[in-house]
Structure formats: C-alpha cells, structure tokens
Amino acid sequence: MNYDKFISEHRLNPEKFREAWAFCLGNPWENPEEADALNDTEYFKEADELAQLALEGKKTATAGDFSEYIRENSPLPKVDGKYDIVLNSKGEPVCAITTTKVYIVKFNEVSAEHARKEGEGDLTLAYWRQVHEEFFRTFGTFRPDMDIVCEEFQVIS
C-alpha cells in the first residue's frame, strides 16, 4: 500500500517512515489472502478501538510476544527517530507514532505502569494480564514466563 498522501498531508519526513501496521493485525493488507482470513474477526474491531486510543493519546504503549518476532524474523521495535503509521481495520492510516522506549520482560513481570500506558479497559494490571493472556492463548503461545516486548510510543501526527 502507498502511504504517500498521509505522509504529505501530515508533513512527515518520508525518509523516516519505517512501516505501517494495525494493532492486533500487523499489516495483512500486504497479503490479500491473509486479509481475507482475518476479515470480520474480533481483531478488526479491536484494531479500530486501539488505533483510536492511540490517536487520542490514551494509548502510549503496546506489547508483543518476543517469540513471534523470532518466528516471523521481524526486527524488534527500536528508538531511532523513525515513525510507524498506525492503520485501522480497513488498512487506512489513523496516526503516526514514534517509539520512545523498548524493553523485554517476562509476562508475569509486566508492570502496572506499562498496563496503564496501554490505555485499555480499566487500566489495571489485572485487566492487562487477562486480555493479553487470552490473546496469546489464542495463538498457543501463552506462558506466564514468556518474554514480552514492551514498546512505548508517542503520537507525532
């Protein structure tokens, strides 16, 4: 997909664009078969809700399964001054974010502060653990001692 219009309208430096993705989904629009498989799932609704929380500044962090990065041979997020474009469930740009902090901790060691920064539900660690455990169990990867990539970010546009 081409994000030139969004980049231009928001006066972003095209040379600092890293990638575009949606919370819970990644970027299935790069592969139409993957997008069709995910279409109309709960993840599409959740992607919209989380993108809106980020746009409003209520969500300033996210978390992922470290082993997923390894399996997918994906680079870890990094603090490098570049930005990502957050997409909605239709693959449309919602906002641009830049990573401000990245660290890896065990699932059972994720802090209440990180849970609050994720901006979801009642902002408690108990809620964060419940929904993230459910999410990781869906993919068969949950373990209390699994490594979690915690990323903090700020909206830049």
Residue positions per predicted region:
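Mixed-charge, low-complexity intrinsically disordered regions
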Residues: 1-96, 105-157
